[in-house]
Amino acid sequence: MKYVIVSGGVISGVGKGIVSSSIGALLKSRGHVVTHFKIDPYLNYNAGRMHPYEHGEVYVLDDGHECDMDFGNYERFNGIKLSGANSIPGGRLLHDIVKCEREGSFLGKTLQINPHIIDEVIRRIRAVADTPVESFGGGQAAVPDVVVVELGGTVGEYESSIYTEALAKFQYVVGKANCAFVSVDYIVELETGEQKTKGIQMGCRNFRRFGLNYDIVICRGRREPNMETRRKISTSCWVKEENVLGLPNLESVYLAPMFLEKHGIVEALNRILGLDDKGMDRRMLDIFSMVGRRHRDGVRIGIVGKYAPEFDSYTSLVNALKFSGAHIGVNVEIVWINSESYSVCDFERCDGVVIPGGFGARGISGKIEAIRHARENGVPLLGICLGYQLSVIEMCRNILGMSDAFSEEFQPSGKNLVVRFISDENGVVDKRLRVGGYGVELRDGLVKKLYGGVETVRERHRHRFEVAQEKVRGLLQHGVRFVGFSSGGKKINVFEVESHPFFVGVQFHPEFNARPDRPHPLITGLVSASYERSK
């Protein structure tokens, strides 16, 4: 078993997740079975309650774990399905260890960082290494031969020191010949063009304090490091000059694997780990090139949300739209519409609209107005999760005349709460989050046709509220069709409007199941309908 361990020592948020995903994709293209593991030093139990401005979107795995957004990159780049076992948030690790102590599992011993926390980190990494990896498209799961481990944050932080120490012991346990350490760090470039490497040098020095040394240094920045910069990093950081690589800002993150491949990262890893290529399959890399390519025609899709786009709040949705655009052969231009400060002109310049998921009352009036505009003007629309619920509310208000139609999330009581807390199969209200992959039974209609005519699909959910079926039956007389239900048919999951080019709402999150080689059919349907409208 071989391990590629990715970390950084200057600043966070420079692309460790993209580099980790790219390394996985490149090794997979050479015939290896790859899995991923991430250590998040923060003390939160998971990413589920973290604000998008703090940490980007919450990515939902099929088993229901709410993870860091990097897990979306791991799954998309490598076409695999991961589980909560592939993740260590610091808070959950401490919680699990204390829980075991309370249950008597440590037989009265004094709990310490070393050995108890450090050994548990090592145990979890090795457990993932022994767990078969499931491909997204199905097929037989295979035991990995390479694990790409990402350490979040930066080396030298208080929170990271425990985990860096664990990685040092991990190298001792599995052997240096089985570990390759990769640094992803930022080069500061002055206006004069001079590249400053002191931050990278200090990051590598901090790493050596734990008895570790980087094998590869990847320099992020506006430009690649010049020869003098490479030489300085090599000398100061004790890394071979040919293993000092650059990764400048690219037009698309999906071009990163090919850029790193061109500059020799696979050959470097092969030398360090003693790996041999087991074959060559470039199909996924070719698809990455297609996703990153510019097309002649374009389509403008509006995303109506309350979170600012620069905080990665809708990363999976943006990726899903790009995949569908590449599949059709059009550029998808995202039009960001703030649901709290908008004008009708914002809606009018869009060929199609997405109302994404979210929580809380802030900005919902703008979303409802966008839904009304799209429905009345024939603009293709896809409502996701909260967007689905608000679409039902808008139709109940403006088609059925239920002016007080609302959601229990925003108004605890009322006559026409058409969206309410989830209830179980016995009708008992259950306020817990419904999260993870669930089956959806499809009825005849456009949505089923887009899915290829299958009877049942599995989609990822994350919600506490559902549409009250008995409150919305009147919509059936106005061309609204409910065409997707939870297993057993008791909960509405999907609607479509017959007299509209594309007006679809889904309770689940299709963006979490979109892949470069398998764009999601509903999102492709939206992009296709929007492109037709733009002609």
UniProtKB/Swiss-Prot annotation:
A Pfam family reported for this protein in Swiss-Prot or TrEMBL: CTP_synth_N
Gene Ontology terms for molecular function: ATP binding; CTP synthase activity; identical protein binding
InterPro entries: Class_I_gatase-like, CTP_synthase, CTP_synthase_N, GATASE, GATase1_CTP_Synthase, P-loop_NTPase
Catalytic machinery residues: C385, H509, E511
Record keywords: ATP-binding, Glutamine amidotransferase, Ligase, Nucleotide-binding, Pyrimidine biosynthesis
GO biological process, alphabetically ordered: 'de novo' CTP biosynthetic process; pyrimidine nucleobase biosynthetic process
Family the UniProt entry places it in: Belongs to the CTP synthase family.
The name this protein goes by in its record: CTP synthase
